[in-house]
Amino acid sequence: MGSLVSSVVFDFGGVIITPITNQISDLAGDLGCSVEVLREVLMGPSHESGSHPWHRLERGEIDQHDLQDALAPYAAALAVPWRGDEVARVLAPGQFTVHDEMIECIRSLRDRGYRTGLLSNSIREFRPTLEHYAPPSLFDVYVDSSEVGRRKPEPEIFSVLLDCLDETDPSRVVFLDDFVANVNGARSVGLRAIHVGDPNSALRELEILLARSPDAT
């Protein structure tokens, strides 16, 4: 039997709430480009963390109001019309739905004795919204990329997470994320990780994994 699971950690976008790709899809239709191209313009490559403006935003290196102009060269390079309101439209409030089953799972895990965590690639200006829909009181640890200056899939952010959990054995931590690159990043440093496509399927996978070892209590 593997190590006893002590902690379960959740991403925010695409796990606790519906993914930002939904907003990108709506905007792509208006701009007359594919979702894939617009996502590349807005968010850069998902398999790495580099100098793309969105990556810098999520590391807290630039402010949200700088993003629109910073992305203009990326849009021009891919012949995407850039009208000046794209970032505001994608990040406008009220465009997502909370997965209530994830919130209930987090509460249940704490009742069963597991430690819970949030690990999110987020934006400094988004913090009030993040805390509203994922209250810190639900979690033992709360890791926001824009606060710690690291973002998934950088190995260093998983080290920050483990330090916050005071956990020396990464295999005792399960992480749920909707981006394959982030799942692979977590696994590369020894965490157990579940890719979230359908939330209910991911929760079933989590319960199967937890059933292989006794409850943390």
Model-derived segments and their meaning:
Residues 1-10, 110, 123-217:
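Asp-based, Mg2+/Mn2+-dependent phosphohydrolase catalytic module
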Residues 109, 114-115:
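Conserved, well-ordered alpha-helix/loop/beta-strand core segments that scaffold catalytic motifs
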Residues 2-103, 111:
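N-terminal helical cap/lid subdomain that shapes the substrate entry/recognition surface
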Residues 33, 114, 191:
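Short glycine/serine/threonine/alanine-rich loop segments
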Residues 118:
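Phosphate-binding loop of NTP-binding sites
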Residues 96-98, 122-125:
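Short beta->alpha connector loops
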Residues 40, 69, 87, 121, ...:
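Proline- and acidic/polar-enriched loop/turn elements at helix boundaries
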